[in-house]
A protein has these predicted regions:
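Bacterial N-terminal signal peptides that target proteins for export
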Residues: 1-10
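Substrate-binding and catalytic surfaces of secreted/luminal carbohydrate-active proteins
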Residues: 36-74, 181-183, 213-221, 225-230, ...
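Residues that line or immediately flank small-molecule/substrate-binding pockets and catalytic motifs
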Residues: 90, 129, 236, 308-309, ...
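N-terminal catalytic cores of secreted or lumenal carbohydrate-active enzymes
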Residues: 53-229, 261
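Short, well-ordered beta-to-alpha junction loops that form the rim of enzyme active sites
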Residues: 130, 184-186, 234-237, 281
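Short acidic/His/Gly/Ser-rich catalytic and metal-binding motifs that mark active-site loops
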Residues: 134-138, 189-196, 238-243, 285-288, ...
């Protein structure tokens, strides 16, 4: 159809007026500018992957409480824990792939992961002390020939970490200086253990002092390399002894003695500021960290409890916090993998249990397992042969795939900045799960909502005498942000 100049002018005028409204520069009938219409920004990921952290149309913020059958109340006047952030683990496997397989895109990928606007802003990372199941070989920082010991740690060295792990961490810190690192050993040197090996066993009591010194030297060694350690856990998964990769059992009495009589006092005498976290294992055995906290000497030095996702329910974080509210909570490991191939189920789990559930359960930081793995779920020594990283880096081509864990983290990490506080919000409303935060730097509010219902759900968000109306597809997650 042929358009006349008048029709073209009307189209341009109408488009301009619509654009002005969209940009909150509304025109009053008298020709003057009205008060800008406040809006909330929205980003969505859907269960069918048609939208992946996709920016959605802005949502008008209305005065008063909009009527809706389902209402999420957000109360910024009630605040809980201060957040340090979200992230994953810089394992040997992750560091190797970042350092050797990304090629020219390395810096861009690191900026995407650790930078802000528009990066993910990852700010909480876990670092294995020595080898884990995701290393290329077994090692500790003080290995000795069979039958020999080194109680003074004369041969202690972090040289194993210089080729990959330390450079990768320094690069991340250069991008995000607020990055906090929690370090965990999978095994202490074999000569300290009952098996004489990195595999299985527990600590020999005569080397408890060497155990504490091992931690001190690690923290000071990393600091000298420009990589400060925010916190340590005594042992990864201390109730489990793997058979084909480094591991060690540390029962509650041993952990209580190590913390209360060795690691805690040594850190105090030498001025080490790193926090000491207990447990670093699953939700199914809260009696273990509670037994350590029941020891009055150990309790003086325990700053918090770290949790994993592989058994039990996230609700125990809340119950343990209720018994010891002065002790902080951190979530330090959960991996996806080939055993759970359905994207929608994974999105629901990672957002519902970790991003929402764990932070509602007092977690100040939430870290998933490997930041990066290759297309074969490696490199790895043993244990999980089909784990999935937050990103996959193809070991041949260097092509990066952003997995469901990437988007689950991004819905929080990109918007909830270090220093934010978890604030009150209602949840479990008509299949909707939610958690809310208030950023400290600009006062912006962030609400993350997951729809676990089988159909689209319409709801209202009420806050401070204002409200938002929104409709969320089945299985989708949305992050809403407003001033």
């Amino acid at each position: 159809m042929k358009r006349s100049p008048l029709r073209e002018s009307l189209i341009v005028l109408c488009a301009g007026l619509l654009g002005a409204c969209a940009n909150d520069n509304a025109i009053s009938p008298g020709g003057g500018a009205t008060t800008p219409v406040p809006v909330a920004q929205a980003w969505m990921t859907t269960a069918d992957q048609s939208r992946l952290l996709s920016r959605q149309p802005d949502v008008p913020i209305r005065s008063g409480a909009e009527a809706s059958a389902l209402v999420i109340e957000v109360d910024e006047g009630t605040s809980y824990q201060e957040m340090i952030g979200f992230g994953a683990a810089m394992t040997d496997a992750s560091a190797y792939l970042i350092q050797h397989k990304l090629g020219a895109q390395r810096d861009a990928i690191l900026r995407e992961l650790f930078g802000r606007d528009p990066g993910l802003g990852l700010s909480f990372m876990r670092v294995p002390m020595g080898a884990s199941d995701f290393s290329t070989h077994d090692y500790s920082y003080d290995d000795m020939p069979a039958g020999q010991t080194d109680p003074t740690l004369a041969r202690f060295s972090i040289d194993e970490d210089r080729p990959d792990k330390l450079p990768a961490l320094r690069s991340a810190l250069a991008i995000n200086p607020k990055l906090k690192l929690v370090a965990s050993p999978w095994s202490l040197p074999g000569w300290m253990k009952t098996t004489g090996s990195l595999i299985k066993g527990t600590m020999r009591p005569e080397f408890y002092g060497s155990f504490a010194e091992y931690f001190r030297r690690f923290v000071e060694g990393y600091k000298a390399e420009g990589v400060p350690i925010f916190a340590v856990t005594l042992q990864n998964e201390p109730a489990y002894e793997p058979t084909n990769y480094p591991g060690m059992r540390l029962d509650p009495p041993a952990r209580a003695e190590l913390i209360g009589k060795h690691v805690g006092p040594l850190f105090g005498r030498t001025g080490i500021q790193a926090l000491i976290l207990d447990w670093d294992h699953n939700w199914d055995l809260p009696s273990s960290p509670l037994a350590v906290l029941a020891d009055s000497t150990a309790r003086r030095y325990v700053n918090g409890i770290a949790w994993h996702c592989y058994a039990g329910d996230v609700g125990v974080q809340d119950s343990v916090h209720a018994e010891y509210p002065a002790k902080d909570t951190y979530f330090t490991e959960c991996s996806g993998g080939g055993w759970a191939p359905v994207y929608a189920d994974n999105l629901k789990f990672f957002v519902g249990k970790l991003i929402i559930g764990s932070t509602r359960g007092w977690a100040k930081g939430v870290a998933l397992w490997n930041l990066a793995l290759d297309e074969n779920g490696g490199p790895h020594l043993g244990g999980c042969g089909n784990c999935r990283g937050v990103i996959t880096i193809n070991s041949v081509t260097g092509v990066v795939t952003r997995n469901v864990e990437y988007y689950a983290l991004a819905h929080a990490s990109q918007f909830v900045r270090p220093g934010a506080h978890h604030i009150a919000s209602t949840t479990d409303v008509g299949g909707l799960q939610s958690v809310a935060f208030k950023n400290a730097d600009d006062g912006s509010k962030v609400l993350i909502v997951l729809n676990t219902a089988p159909a689209e759900v319409s709801f209202a968000v009420h806050f401070g005498g204002r409200s938002i109306l929104y409709a969320l597809p089945a299985g989708a997650v949305v992050t809403l942000r407003w001033s």
